[in-house]
UniProtKB/Swiss-Prot annotation:
Name by which UniProt lists this protein: Small ribosomal subunit protein uS14
One example of a Gene Ontology biological process annotation: translation
Domain of life (superkingdom): Bacteria
Subunit structure: Part of the 30S ribosomal subunit. Contacts proteins S3 and S10.
Functional summary from the UniProt entry: Binds 16S rRNA, required for the assembly of 30S particles and may also be responsible for determining the conformation of the 16S rRNA at the A site.
Organism: Acetivibrio thermocellus (strain ATCC 27405 / DSM 1237 / JCM 9322 / NBRC 103400 / NCIMB 10682 / NRRL B-4536 / VPI 7372)
GO molecular function: rRNA binding; structural constituent of ribosome; zinc ion binding
Listed PROSITE patterns: RIBOSOMAL_S14
Amino acid sequence: MAKKSLIVKQQRKPKYRTRAYNRCKLCGRPHAYMRKFGICRLCFRDLAYKGQIPGVRKASW
């Protein structure tokens, strides 16, 4: 989990556009963010494993 203070700080509009960054909508993690889903890789993995993301399957070849 991310610090609550950092999540609140990120929600404010930054003074400069380059300071804006993406955070996971579920846990607030700033790294390994997937734009298409709006969540980090860890949350993506958990949700995909539970079958809560439609159209996502585990790769097997």
